[in-house]
């Protein structure tokens, strides 16, 4: 079970009756009050425990800011790209729902399946600040991982480097 692959959604609605009827399992990580819902075929308690333990290890590494430890566990480019996408769309959902992670058995944790940009593209306003999702004063909480990562100079440098790489494409479109 320690090498189980999985797909999870970070979703404040994870504890709903609808998910219970679907047979979906959820759990919390320390310091968070939003559910991680197991969306993949994880059937046993041992598999569920392995998924939670692995995600907890990743969570602790991210919050620690230890880049070397994070690179052992996560696909860092997927985190950089997802952060940029969430920032460009100013997507308020990222801190509370529709945030997916996946891991192939034995692989690294990846941010995947960008989803649910209706609020970011016009049906909701977070007009308190134009400085991004992790700024203080925003009405919607940031995702704790992005908030922690933006406190790391090396992550900001990775984001800036990637933005410089994709900027010409963005300016063309």
Residue ranges and their predicted role:
Residues 1-173:
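Phosphate/dinucleotide-binding and metal-coordinating scaffold of catalytic cores
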């Amino acid at each position: 079970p320690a090498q189980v692959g999985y797909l999870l959604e970070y979703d404040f609605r994870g504890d709903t009756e609808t998910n219970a009827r679907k047979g979906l399992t959820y759990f919390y990580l320390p310091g968070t009050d939003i559910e991680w819902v197991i969306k993949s075929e994880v059937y046993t308690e041992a598999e569920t425990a392995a998924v939670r333990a692995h995600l907890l290890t990743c969570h602790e590494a991210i919050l620690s800011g230890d880049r070397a430890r994070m690179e052992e566990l996560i696909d860092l480019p997927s985190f950089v790209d997802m952060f940029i996408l969430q920032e460009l769309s100013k997507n308020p959902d990222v801190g509370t729902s529709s945030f997916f992670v996946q891991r192939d058995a034995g692989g690294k944790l990846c941010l995947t399946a960008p989803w649910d940009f209706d609020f970011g593209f016009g049906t909701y306003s977070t007009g308190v600040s134009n400085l991004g999702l992790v700024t203080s004063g925003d009405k919607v909480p940031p995702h704790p991982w992005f908030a922690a990562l933006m406190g790391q100079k090396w992550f900001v440098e990775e984001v800036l480097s990637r933005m410089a790489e994709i900027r010409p494409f963005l300016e063309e479109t």
